[in-house]
Amino acid sequence: GVCGELNCKPLTSVVLQGLFSHLMVGVNMVNAPTIAKQRDITIREVRSDEAGAYQTLISLLVVTENQSRSIRGTLFNDEPRVVEIKDIPIDAKLGPNMLYITNRDKPGLIGNLGSVLGDAGVNIATFHLGRADEGGNAIALIEVDGTPPEAVMDAVCELENVVQAIAMRF
């Protein structure tokens, strides 16, 4: 779509900065491409003018020796939205404080999660769900008011059918 015509270098630099900032200090969008090159990390920018379901769609695939992760995003009314994570469709508007939860798609998870957060005084602002298939892998992106304390995140991780729970701040 429209993104196929754009200069992707600044976006690539910001993505690299975000990936490296969790591993080292002093990373910025100017030096991130150089750090990638020094570490023999292969970067491929692929563009397509092919029209699809979205007028603009940006996909990110990170492949390591141990795993691969993917995410796709677009713009709806000039607001960024996540539309796919690890091949699981989702429609999520991001907020400043988010919980990223991977889980098995089983009954009771949403209620139990809401109870843990509510009992701790953590307010849910938005709740976005996606699943691969019935009873299979699922993802929740939840906007909350404030960053949940570590003890709350530990309680979320201990819920039945939760595989992983991460607090994110944007």
What does each model-identified segment do?
Residues 1-170:
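A conserved regulatory-domain signal marking ACT and ACT-like small-molecule sensing domains
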